[in-house]
Amino acid sequence: MVLELSKLNVADNSGAKEVGVIRVLGGSRKKTANIGDVIICSVKKAIPTGIVKEGQVVKAVIVRSVYGIHRENGQHIRFDDNAVVIIKDDKTPRGTRVFGPVARELRDKGYLKIVSLAPEVL
């Protein structure tokens, strides 16, 4: 579960390394986000030659969560870190590569490009 003001790692090559959560999208009372949810973030750390710069406000989708998710078949998937991929308004990633594994639930939520770029889908 990711709350507002949480710091997250960035799992793509858009230039950002760490982001801070400003807002969880999906309703006025929604306070937490999990895998597949869209959040609005501020870039806290970035490389100087990247697409996004420090201080920029971007949209991102959560691809890994320490809290984990419960599947209908009884599996519980949990990751080692909280990570996001920075996206455009049409659900496509701003970077051209995705680092690390991503959850299969992203395919159900319409992020097919992120799933196809990921080296491993769990």
UniProtKB/Swiss-Prot annotation:
Superkingdom, taxonomy of origin: Bacteria
Gene Ontology process terms (BP): translation
A GO molecular-function annotation: structural constituent of ribosome
Keyword ATP-binding: no
Keywords assigned by UniProt, alphabetized: Ribonucleoprotein, Ribosomal protein, RNA-binding, rRNA-binding
CC annotations in GO: cytosolic large ribosomal subunit
Keyword Ribosomal protein: yes
InterPro entries: Ribosomal_uL14, Ribosomal_uL14_bac-type, Ribosomal_uL14_CS, Ribosomal_uL14_sf
Protein role: Binds to 23S rRNA. Forms part of two intersubunit bridges in the 70S ribosome.
Protein family according to the UniProt entry: Belongs to the universal ribosomal protein uL14 family.
Quaternary structure and interacting proteins, as annotated: Part of the 50S ribosomal subunit. Forms a cluster with proteins L3 and L19. In the 70S ribosome, L14 and L19 interact and together make contacts with the 16S rRNA in bridges B5 and B8.
Record-given protein name: Large ribosomal subunit protein uL14
Provenance organism: Mycoplasmopsis agalactiae (strain NCTC 10123 / CIP 59.7 / PG2)
